[in-house]
Amino acid sequence: MLKSVIENVHALEIFDSRGNPTVEVFVTLSNGVVGKAEVPSGASTGENEAVELRDGGSRLGGKGVMNAVNNVNTEINDALKGLDPHDQPNIDATMIALDGTPNKGRLGANAILGVSMATAAAAAKDNHQPLYRYLGGTDLEMPQTFHNVINGGEHADNGIDIQEFMITPVAKTSFRDGFEKIVNVYHTLKKVLEDMGYETGLGDEGGFAPNMKNSEEALKALHESIIKAGYKPGEDIAIACDCAASYFYNKEDGKYHLEGKVLTDEELADYYDKLLDEFPELISMEDPYDENDVEGMVKFTQSHKDRIQIVLDDFICTNPKLLNKAIHEGAGNASLIKLNQIGTVTETLETIRLSRKNGYNTMISHRSGETGDTFIADFAVAVNGGQLKTGAPARSERVEKYNRLLEIEEELGKGERLAFFPDNVDLD
């Protein structure tokens, strides 16, 4: 039987959950098998992320992606024809070399990632395997999910500076059991917010976007909702935050402008300590300091690494070189993993391996501009990612991922392994 090879790579411009253009890619093999991928995009982006190629000009507010689409349909298609779709490292290395820039800025990370993901999808189909099995083999684990149920910062038009307030099921008997707990708290939260006099419109990631005064009020609403839903804060459901501190850091004075206050590194740490003392169920903080504030991040890690999970997002941008630097500096104890920050499946896997080797947890993540593509659900299971965040249990582009995880759990059958976090954090 002849080995299948890539016959054609084709892209077109589609739209994401924010109504912005993005790239969809189809990889067709010589035996007729087709793999498809849709590329997400972020609103809160790190300085060191791989570059999305946007068209500029007046069409679609300058956000069109026809140049990226054309790059797929011409240069990338020509370069990949005849290659083995099962050799993912070679596919990705070929595109990186073809691009020739350190940030994928010539062809576009949105073009390259779409092809990388679609190739993996095609190869899995060619093997008659689900994507999670093709990428991950047999020793698989269902991830613990983190759900952004109150949106602030760049993800909502309200007065909260911290970007995401998440809930996570720390006690569960199955993925479905944990997800049902989250759904119960989510619906309870809506009623709690209404009783507090807030509107319950949704932000980009399906969470509510109430115009609250400060982050403490958001945490109080979550705490109350967990209890009213019939659960114990910290024992059944815990809380996590994405601070996205780069968005309230002022480069001119080197201080953090947060909720009407101007704070130094030390004062910001005191502010976080106040929240942690008041809400011991708060177990994880993402990007608590600006992506260039190495001193602040390292000091906070030294003083808090045994108390909470400190997740690096903008600080490392899923880049193994930046992660290696953070490891040597002693920053953080967990890595946020976003495929489109680095731009290929292979490089994403490299960052995950480096994280594991150095004792860092990993949290696979969606972006605020999403599509119905469920690649990251399979990916999180395949790499035993441990943790996954992909929004609230609302808006179809978010729920599609959770529904895919429910399908995967059913396919794995009884006895599937569950990721649990925290296992090193004292919640008493």
From Swiss-Prot:
Q: Name the positions where Mg(2+) binds.
A: D242, E286, D313
A GO cellular-component term linked to this record:
cell surface
Superkingdom, taxonomy of origin: Bacteria
- Keywords carried by this UniProt record: Cytoplasm, Glycolysis, Lyase, Magnesium, Metal-binding, Secreted
Q: Check the record and name the InterPro entries matching this protein.
A: Enolase, Enolase-like_C_sf, Enolase-like_N, Enolase_C, Enolase_CS, Enolase_N
Which residue positions does the secretion signal occupy? none
- List positions binding (2R)-2-phosphoglycerate: Q163, K338, R367, S368, K389
Cofactor stoichiometry and binding remark: Binds a second Mg(2+) ion via substrate during catalysis.
Active site residues according to the UniProt entry: E205, K338
**Subcellular location field:** Cytoplasm; Secreted; Cell surface
Major localization class: cytoplasm
Q: In which pathway does it act?
A: Carbohydrate degradation; glycolysis; pyruvate from D-glyceraldehyde 3-phosphate: step 4/5
Q: What is its EC number?
A: 4.2.1.11
SMART domains in the cross-refs: Enolase_C, Enolase_N
Name the coenzymes or cofactors required: Mg(2+)
A Pfam family for this UniProt protein?
A: Enolase_N
- The question of whether Lipid metabolism is a record keyword is answered with no
Provide the GO MF annotations for this entry: laminin binding; magnesium ion binding; phosphopyruvate hydratase activity
Q: Name one GO biological process term.
A: glycolytic process
Q: Which CDD domains match?
A: enolase
Kindly state which reaction or reactions the protein catalyses: (2R)-2-phosphoglycerate = phosphoenolpyruvate + H2O
NCBIfam families hit by this protein:
eno (TIGR01060)
**What's the stated role of this polypeptide?**
Catalyzes the reversible conversion of 2-phosphoglycerate (2-PG) into phosphoenolpyruvate (PEP). It is essential for the degradation of carbohydrates via glycolysis.
What family is this?
Answer: Belongs to the enolase family.
Protein name as annotated = Enolase 3
